[in-house]
């Protein structure tokens, strides 16, 4: 009987942990993208799967948005996201997004330059390491490699 009760408690704790694993992420985000970019819509679906309500804004003036967000030159990608007090540039893997909110560094945001294959929203298998950078005031520093 005790063994059964212990098993129930452990399984309940595991289920609670799985249900709250993404609790650190904000409830809402705004994704700015080029109107013709479908991979950005796919990236939004990945955030939505983590419980984030994503508003998509089609905007061809992404340069201004990136500059206001503090995205360094050369780190630009096809979309910029405002989420909580941070900006996310490009197809940053969800693991890095979650790490950003768990660690809460004093930065403007994180970014992954270009549109690497295998990242959220980009089809295909990962073919190279993903170097994710922290950025503030147009300056970038390494954050993590996935």
Predicted regions: what they are:
Residues 7-17:
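Bacterial N-terminal signal peptides
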Residues 28-29, 52-54, 84-87:
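Short active-site oxyanion
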């Amino acid at each position: 009987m005790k063994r059964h009760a212990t098993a129930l408690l452990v399984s309940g704790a595991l289920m609670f942990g799985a249900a709250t694993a993404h609790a650190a992420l904000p409830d809402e985000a705004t994704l700015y993208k080029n109107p013709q970019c479908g991979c950005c819509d796919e990236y939004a679906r990945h955030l939505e799967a983590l419980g984030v309500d994503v508003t998509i804004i089609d905007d061809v003036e992404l340069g201004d948005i990136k500059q206001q967000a503090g995205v360094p030159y050369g780190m630009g990608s096809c979309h910029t996201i405002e989420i909580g007090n941070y900006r996310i540039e490009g197809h940053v893997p969800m693991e890095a997004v979650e790490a950003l909110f768990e660690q809460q560094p004093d930065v403007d945001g994180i970014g992954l330059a270009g549109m690497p294959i295998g990242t959220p929203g980009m089809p295909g298998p990962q073919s190279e390491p993903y170097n994710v950078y922290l950025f503030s005031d147009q300056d970038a520093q390494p954050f993590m490699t996935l």
